[in-house]
Amino acid sequence: EKKIIASKAVSCLQEGYVIFLDISTINLEVAKIIFEKNIPLTIVTNMIDIMQLYRQESKVRLIFLGGDFNQARDGFVGTLTNSLIKNYRFDLSFIGVVGIDLQHNTISTYETNDGLTKKEIITASKQAYMVGESAKLNQDGNYIFASLDDFTGYICEKTLDDNTIQILKKHHIELK
């Protein structure tokens, strides 16, 4: 499932883009595909696993943002990370989500600092896509960081039911 989502995400990219990959296992898969295809673009990330992937030579320019280390998330979040993000304007970002509550129009994650960092990434992005398995629909995390209206689109592994598609379209969400 994660690899299907990652492949769809990579199909949105263009050479020369500046993108943000936040802390997400799907985004690690996105980074692997970009690395394998050697797509010339700039990745900005706060995820350690993505940084480690790019230790080898590549056409990708990698910018790693530090901050407060969150062991549970395997990356950096918080005030310092957020202040660094504010210095960028990303062509596109892929944001991992824990929950997409269609009824209440909320997008959530587990931790406050992670959510605040995701919010800054969205603000700094020309286009922001939620990436997550369809099982994340109508799930909840502990911290709401956005609404559907904050996103350009949603990338998942399968075709969704008509009711879900209608709700997402009402919020102008592109489906991939």
Model-derived features: positions:
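N-terminal active-site beta-alpha-beta segment that forms phosphate/nucleotide-binding
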Residues: E1-Y88
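Conserved phosphate- and dinucleotide-binding cores of soluble alpha/beta proteins
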Residues: M51-K176
